[in-house]
Regions:
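Contiguous hydrophobic, core-forming segments of folded domains
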Residues: 34, 38-85, 106-220
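C-terminal motif of bacterial Sec signal peptides marking the signal peptidase cleavage site
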Residues: 17-19
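Residue-level signal for mature regions of secreted extracellular proteins and peptides
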Residues: 13-14
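Bacterial signal peptide processing site
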Residues: 21-23
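Extended beta-strand-rich segments in extracellular/periplasmic secretory proteins, especially
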Residues: 82-104, 207-240
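Bacterial N-terminal signal peptides that target proteins for export
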Residues: 1-9
Length: 240
């Protein structure tokens, strides 16, 4: 894979995480914050300009590595986080990367987001993948997450069809093999790609949002939409 020099991207996140016990937290990080504003989103189709195309349509990936500070088991753990952005042709019927150029293909901006850290005696490995249409006029087409650690491993995949279709697998009893659907809502996972395409299109106001799949697994909370408030200012985007 070819790589390029990265653009600066600074995003801070604080997760208060649980141990291997499957205890559901009542303290969600995304709690409702009432404001006198309504959620607004931009659904106008994004049309890449010359600069966008020159940067993203070169067959190269943008790779950025960060020093990671991750809260886990009541302590701050240190590790590495990597963001890998690349454009790809995506076959919507099978919801996979297209092997050949075909008219039905959709151009997507893919983000593979990894975290690796150690909790004193054993390692954690987290990877999330988001496939977001460059047209920026719909939700992510596909999102997946896998987590490996010494307690076991989990995997969840979300496919955007008539509804959000969820396929989840976990070593925890009440999160074991499950398949269900959700009404479509904003996805925290897709915001990272939407930000790179058009920051001004990010949703603001009081919103319903499905937290990142990583958050769902580490906090052991139900996979569904929660209420939050979002604000966009110069150089920052905040969820409360």
């Amino acid at each position: 894979m070819k790589t390029k020099n990265t653009l600066p991207l600074i995003v801070s996140a604080l997760l208060i995480l649980l141990s291997c016990t499957n205890k559901e937290s009542k303290d969600l990080a995304l709690l409702v914050t009432k404001k006198d504003t309504k959620a607004t989103t931009v659904t106008e189709t994004f049309k890449p300009n010359k600069d966008f195309s020159a940067y993203w349509y070169t067959g190269e990936a943008e790779i950025t590595s960060y020093k990671l500070e991750q809260s886990r088991y009541g302590e701050t753990r240190h590790g590495t986080a990597i963001l890998i952005y690349v454009t790809e042709p995506f076959l919507e019927t099978k919801q996979v990367k297209a092997d050949y150029s075909n008219p039905p293909n959709i151009n997507v901006l893919k983000l593979n987001r990894t975290k690796n850290f150690t909790t004193g005696i054993y390692p954690y490995s987290i990877m999330q993948s988001t496939f977001y249409p460059i047209a920026n006029n719909r939700h992510a087409i596909k999102v997946s997450c896998s987590i490996q650690e010494w307690c076991g491993h989990v995997y969840t995949q979300l496919n955007n069809r008539k509804q959000f279709e969820i396929d989840a697998h976990s070593y925890f009893e009440n999160q074991a093999d499950s398949n269900f659907t959700l009404d479509k809502n904003i996805l925290e996972n897709e915001l990272w790609t939407q930000l790179r395409i058009d920051p001004k299109s990010l949703p603001v106001g009081d919103i319903s949002i499905i937290p990142s799949l990583e958050f769902i697994h580490l906090k052991h909370v139900p996979l569904k939409a929660y209420q939050a408030s979002a604000s966009l200012a110069k150089g920052s985007y905040t969820l409360n």
